[in-house]
Amino acid sequence: MSARDFVEGEAMLDEEENEEELVDDYGDGEERLETGGNHYDSSEEDEDEDDDEDAVRAVREGFIVDEDEEEEERAERRRERRKRRREEREREDEHLDEEDLELIGELNPGLQYAAAADSKFKRLKRGHKDRDSRQPSQAINDFFNSDEEDEPAPDYGRHRRHPGDEMDDFIEEDVFSDDELQREREDLEVARPRKTIGFGATDTTGLDENALEDMRAAFGDGNEYDFALAMEEEEEQQEEDVEKHLDLKDVFEPSQLAEKMLTEEDNQIRLIDEPERHQIARKPYRNVVLSEDQFREEAAWIANLMLLKKRLEPELREPFQRSVAKVLEFLVTDDWEVPFIFQHRKDYMIHTVKVPVNGASADDSSSQYTIKAEKLLNMTDLWDIFDYDLKFKALVEKRNTIQKTYDNIRSVFSVEDPIVEEMLPIATTMEELQDIQDYLHFQYASQIRDLTLTNGDTNGEVQRRKALTRNFFERVRNSKAYGLVRAFGITADAFAQNALKEGRRQYTEDASERPEDMADGLVDNDFNNSSQVLKAAKGMFAEEIVMSPKMRKVIRQAYYMNGAVDCFRTEKGLRRIDEQHPYYEFKYLRDQQLSDIARSPELFLRMLKAEEEGLIEVKVRFENFENFRKRLYPNIESDNYSELADSWNRLRREAVDLALGKLERVINRSVKENIRQECENHVAKECREAFSQRLDQAPYKPKGMILGTVPRVLALSTGTGIIGRAPIHWAYVEEDGRVLENGKFTDLSLGDKDRGIADGKDLEALVELVNRRRPDVIGVSGMSPETRRLYKLLTEIVDAKDLRGALYTDDRDEEVSDRLEVVIVNDEVARLYQNSDRAKKDHPSFAPLTHYCVGLAKYLQSPLKEYASLGRDIVSIQFKPGQQLVAQELLLKQLETALVDMVNLVGVDINEAVSDPATANLLPYVCGLGPRKAAHLLKIVNMTGGVVNSRFSLLGVGVQYPAMGVKVWNNSASFLYIDYESADADSDPLDNTRVHPEDYDIARKMAADALELDEEDIKAETDENGPGAIVRKLFREDAQDRVNDLILEEYAEQLEKNLNQRKRATLETIRAELQQPYEELRKHFVFLSTDDIFTMLTGETAQTLAEGMVVPISIKSIRDDHIEGKLDCGVDALVGESEMTDRYDIPVRAIYSLHQTVPAKVMFLNRKTFTCNVSLREEQVSRPSRPAADRAHAGEWDYRQEEQDREALEAKTQDGGRTMRVIKHPLFRPFNSTQAVEFLGSQSRGDVVIRPSSKGPDHLAVTWKVADGIFQHIDVLELDKENEFSVGRTLKVGGRFTYSDLDDLIFNHVKAMAKKVDEMMLHEKYQEGSKDSTYQWLETYTKANPRRSAYAFCIDPKHAGYFFLCFKAGEHAQVHSWPVKVIPQGYELQRNPYPDMRALCNGFKLLFTNMQSGKRR
């Protein structure tokens, strides 16, 4: 098979003819396996069995680590010696026993039979084993049988193994009853019979008692040393027990432990008293400790970076810097997380100024004034500071590494380098540090190499490569030619200083003779003529300019000021990117300024994606580079006027040109990468902002209830079905989240009494359900525009049947009810929930669409809980265009911060979290916690009774089971609330507020002042009813409004004066919480806009479906004056009489047929009604709109190149002389390969598109979806055609398969192969992921099971319709792979067909075994 068959868009050629080329592409299986060379000889295995036992055990216990190897080896040798001694004793015992038996047998012939029988039985067993090893069929069955574990012979010397033992590590302490312990001991005694060395009973020796007594007196009874043997055996048993102790890592794969967060590192995170998110983020920088000076430097560094993006008044800059420094101190020194700082240290983020009233003096304390407050930092800024802190630590770590290298060079070689000493302390970016590091390795290459060799750290290939690349410049530096470099009259650093315009200008001095003449006198063995000397010196000086940190800084600054981005289509892009392609927007885009890129970061990321796909080349260039070059020349030239000066200046300019060429390439790469990172960060933050807006909505508010009340919901949906044909699934969900009822309705149509039309059969049941359950709202959603019809139907039913919600008391204290509201619900979470494992676990008996309805209802009840429940799947939701182009971890990190912000704004009822999994999903986002600490908290609460009575009970000080440490408690306390029970004397009302326990005394003082209690009253109340008595009294007397009378300014001043605490904003929070504890601060539930509903139900956005675009429509009805059709997205299309055709001489029905798919141009789109007007006229269809090009500004779009490409493509089309072919088949689309792939991208696996072929009128192309991102293009040859436009009566695929029509081909070829692909991907041996990850799995498996061979299948993404069969014949063998081809009848491996997966696996084993046997011969 040729290479171009595997390129997307090309149909398959004759498979029979090209099979060998595919084999060559993969490599010949047998030749590749020869390097593995693993022969399976049973005799060799038997000989090595003892030697390998210990290695096997070591691998299984931990994949053999290098730590403490010597100690382990010594222990292993001791165990081996004891094992050998024990085996020798047992052999001696057996030998003696046989002699005794022979002796006894002579005296007692009747006993000989038993011994003989036993001996015969042993021989039979050995013979059976030998016979098995010689049977090849058995070897084939056992080969690669990794799922069937070898069954070891029973070992009665080991502990009894219970089925549940692998779960031991999940159990804290199992306490067994005395009976169980006794049974265990009895089992052990039976399992390990004690072998004693001594004389047998009298009836087996033939000696009388007296003779025995004499013998014992002379020789002893054989038990004199039993105590020593018993001690040794006990010691050995203890060692065996230690060795047999299983950790989780012995039972589970490392990836499984990491997924379940059960690794040792996870346990450390749980136990360390530090916020979990801080621990994870700071993990790479644990060893970086900042000095006080560095900490101050960091604060200034972060403030300066943030000021670039802030628009602050000059007088606010200094307060801003102080605020940043204080927040940094809270984050780093105090280990407070962002939500805590934002909630409880607000005063440090606000700058307040006292403004005197009526022009009084600000210094006059008696004058009146107002407070002018300026907010300096918001929540996003705090997260930015957290990120900047990590970046600064990375910066310091790299700087320390460079400083250490320089210190070593300076101390060993007595070198002082002013460039390093000047530039290193002031470097503020990673690029600048890298410049200094490159300079060091260039300037002191030999010294660093000597140091490296001295320290024994060769750094592998990287070090050797660096040594080779520096070799030429070291030769120049050590030769006479370097004298010519010095004669340039100025150093590279001085030249860069002039270019930077920093400090005093450095002047260039000319040498006393011309460069050529000087070069003649500098010839040596390295450079043996003047031209070589000149070339070497010029290259050396240019390299010194390139390596100058200051010069790189000059170029980098100029690049960012003068950078521009150009896009150039590749040959592949010329064909693939047509005017309907999403990349056409920048196919001919030129001269985009970096400021333009900053305004549309998503566009640049798409450019890079297109470049990655080989369709576009993105070039970042330096505008007016020639002018910049000319401006640099005066900084290196001398001011002298002479022929001598001219010759030197000419050489200097040549060196500068040489250096600038290399500098441009070096800086270009870093600039392009930096722009990409900035664009990714920008898009990720846009996603975070969009997610924050979706999170910032309270539950749907029932009529008459306060904001935050959870509604009762009835949710309905038809999914993708059509009303009247498909059932309507529904679910009723209570406010506590329980699904009390669910079912299906088939007919909810409203009747018409006047016309004698009865109501639908299920309408009465719906009305009865609503009247019985009294939901607060009806939620509707779906996956097609049919949902709009369901919404209208339900709205009409509510009006016609006067369906109302629950009763509530209005402002006049009367009980009323309102008509139910029907709401179209955002279903992005419900779509992910309906087929999730969580849904199956919650309601295993529900249908997927019922799960979907449950998801809709729960979204209405709490959007926050539903989003939090998604975990890492949150990235599946589309928040912003270009989101998929952002690194997933970066996106997850940004989205997590949005969840953290909102969860801590809302708070979590800790007792509800213990009993409700949906609420428990919020705990990982609580300040100070994370998934590990949250799980630990729930575990401890359940262990200690399952109820939390106060916030202080969570503090793990002096308790048996600490839920959290002091730091974590300080972070999380105010965000975990406990419902206040007025009947409970120990319940503290402040535990149900946002007030932090550190401020409880302030809150109680404010409550006492509001109640006008004096000190004696306060003491009496608290002595009698505890510290919370004052606030309870405030609540009990409904006197919360009195706190509004308090003058908080005085409180704040006293706190700052006496305790040095700034609490003005905190006092406002306390006042609000005393009036309404944990008030709902989120916005009202957000209803979807028209555009949002349109996108949700059709999947189309303003970018993918707009007026002027050409789209395929399926014709549903043909009339004389109009045609009705439907777009693929479900939008109804109407073709007016004037837009049906350009050929008025032919009847419309002769041109078009029902269910035919034709291209149409959208003339008008109504997103509210899901309808559009389209044109089928060739004149309109051939001129689609070009919104991308139309949006481009003059001078930024290469119209000339676009026109040239269009003319070239038209000429090619005319040469082909073909018209667009249309076939009457529901799967036909007038697509090219790219459009077919895009169309099938969102479809299911196995879906098909029939399309025209580029090979001519006697060919068709069939594209089908093999898997996500993998599509196969099949070339279909048509034979026996009636005419050029009809479909052939015989269809041939690959010269092997023949079909009678398209339906036969689709069903028996494509669908048959799709079934085989499903069978492969559902097989237990199939591995998700790439070939490399499958190789890694095989490596891991064979390390854990050294004596086993393993194989697995994985998909081949480059060759559609092929899979890899990857296998590894033992721990030390190489990993190999063979291609497996999917065919309609099954699979092909090594040109052998197999009907199913079982036959394929067996065939592979047989092929491999035969190949190995052939090698042995």
UniProtKB/Swiss-Prot annotation:
Residue segments, region Disordered: 1-109, 122-185, 1181-1215
Molecular-function GO terms, alphabetical: DNA binding; histone binding; nucleosome binding; transcription antitermination factor activity, DNA binding
Cellular compartment(s): Nucleus; Chromosome
Keyword Transcription carried by entry: yes
Gene3D superfamilies per record: RuvA domain 2-like (1.10.10.650), SH2 domain (3.30.505.10), Spt6, Death-like domain (1.10.10.2740), Spt6, helix-hairpin-helix domain (1.10.150.850), Tex N-terminal region-like (1.10.3500.10), YqgF/RNase H-like domain (3.30.420.140)
Lineage: Eukaryota, Fungi, Dikarya, Ascomycota, Pezizomycotina
Chain ranges of the S1 motif domain: 1108-1177
Organism: Emericella nidulans (strain FGSC A4 / ATCC 38163 / CBS 112.46 / NRRL 194 / M139)
One of the GO biological process terms: positive regulation of transcription elongation by RNA polymerase II
Extent of Basic and acidic residues compositional bias: 1188-1215
Listed Polar residues bias regions: 135-144
One GO CC annotation: transcription elongation factor complex
Keywords: Chromosome, Nucleus, SH2 domain, Transcription
Family membership: Belongs to the SPT6 family.
Highest taxon listed in the record's lineage: Eukaryota
Compositional bias ranges of the Acidic residues kind: 11-28, 43-54, 64-73, 166-179
Function, as annotated: Histone H3-H4 chaperone that plays a role in maintenance of chromatin structure during RNA polymerase II transcription elongation thereby repressing transcription initiation from cryptic promoters. Mediates the reassembly of nucleosomes onto the promoters of at least a selected set of genes during repression; the nucleosome reassembly is essential for transcriptional repression. Essential for viability.
This protein's name: Transcription elongation factor spt6
InterPro entries attached to this UniProt entry: HHH_9 (IPR041692), NA-bd_OB-fold (IPR012340), RNaseH-like_sf (IPR012337), RuvA_2-like (IPR010994), SH2_dom_sf (IPR036860), Spt6-like_S1 (IPR049540), Spt6_acidic_N_dom (IPR028083), Spt6_death-like (IPR042066)
SH2 domain location: 1226-1326
